[in-house]
């Protein structure tokens, strides 16, 4: 198990050492609720919520995942989606589109694996679509002002300690 950044176009996961005085450390696979952790590695991730978490067929917004790295890996390997979803929280239901890209110092990539590539990307691009709900009817407002609107945003986050990695030679 390694710390670093792991991502695709539709999800991003950061894993880092995060020791906690309040955490209760338990053997891997134990069913202890609350602050129980199996290791000091903490994973934080972002993705669009999926239809299995809601009653709609559409993605439900920006979701944040936080949990013990070993326990999340074990749940994923065992196909235990319930344990994986337990750490998923909806943070921005108005987000309707989310795309990540990773800059290796030479070109943009659609995926990143710090373990396989030997480091962090030099930058991460985040494309967000945010949809505002339709407005409630009010006399004097035109019909077009009551419709849902979607705005797109682009944010590039530089990781200044990262070194360029020529991934075309890997």
Where are the regions that the model predicts?
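Extracytoplasmic beta-strand-rich oligomerization domains located immediately C-terminal to a leader/signal peptide
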Residues: 1-80, 127
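Short linear sequence signals and composition-biased patches located at protein termini or domain-edge surfaces
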Residues: 85-170
């Amino acid at each position: 198990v390694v710390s670093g950044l792991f991502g695709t176009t539709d999800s991003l996961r950061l894993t880092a050492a995060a020791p906690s005085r309040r955490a209760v450390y338990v053997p891997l696979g134990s069913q202890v609720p609350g602050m129980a952790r199996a290791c000091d590695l903490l994973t934080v991730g972002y993705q669009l919520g999926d239809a299995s978490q809601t009653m709609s067929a559409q993605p439900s917004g920006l979701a944040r995942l936080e949990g013990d790295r070993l326990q999340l890996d074990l749940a994923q390997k065992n196909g235990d989606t319930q344990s994986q979803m337990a750490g998923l929280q909806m943070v921005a239901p108005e987000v309707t589109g989310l795309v990540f890209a990773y800059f290796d110092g030479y070109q943009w990539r659609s995926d990143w694996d710090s373990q396989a590539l030997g480091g962090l990307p030099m930058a991460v691009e985040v494309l967000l679509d945010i949809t505002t709900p339709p407005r409630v009817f009010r006399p004097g407002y035109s019909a077009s002002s009551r419709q849902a609107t979607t705005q797109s945003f682009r944010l590039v986050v530089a990781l200044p300690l990262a070194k360029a990695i020529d991934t075309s030679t890997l």
